[in-house]
Amino acid sequence: MDFLTGGTSDWPDAGFPGIKINPDSLVPQIVNEETCAQALAASTDPGDLIFVRLVEGHAAEAAELLAEARYNDPSSLRLRIFEADILRVSNRLDRAVDLFRQLLAETRGTPDEAVIRQHLGQSYFASGNIAAAVEAYAKALDLRVAGSADAALIYASTVALQRARYVLDLTS
């Protein structure tokens, strides 16, 4: 059963052209290969290529790119998030959750807490810990609303929370 109907136009933005978040799986997915390829060709940010390779399911290549990028910018939160996402995509879900919990401890009370909670929710959802995913998504949404975040981020958190609650209700 599709959570949102009507094609991909209602899917939340994933933060890169041509990529949106599948509202059923809550995983980023390429929805327009041409747009994605053009944006990637124009980008000079190594994080963009890492993200696209992750979305494509190429975790090993993403990990190699990440190692080089982290060497040049070891404290980058975005790159540390990619490290945990690589673990998630590689089905090392417990390790991904542990790393996101560590990042959460480091970002609690900062503007970055919401993005970490959103990613933590995604890892919980992927691991089947739906109750924890609901909690993480709810807190991410609360923080984004309280912080007057971009509407696209609030929408992404709303869709993720609704989907996680729906799945939780199915399993209850």
Regions found by a protein language model. Name each.
Residues 1-67, 71-73, 89, 169-172:
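N-terminal alpha-helical interaction modules that lie
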Residues 37, 70, 104-107, 141, ...:
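A conserved position within tetratricopeptide repeats
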Residues 41, 75, 112, 152-156:
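Structural signature of alpha-solenoid helical repeat junctions
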Residues 47-56, 67-115:
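Alpha-helical adaptor scaffolds
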Residues 48, 82, 119, 126, ...:
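"A position-specific structural signal for the A-helix of alpha-solenoid helical repeats
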Residues 92-95, 128-131, 159-172:
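Alpha-helical linker/edge segments of TPR/alpha-solenoid repeat scaffolds
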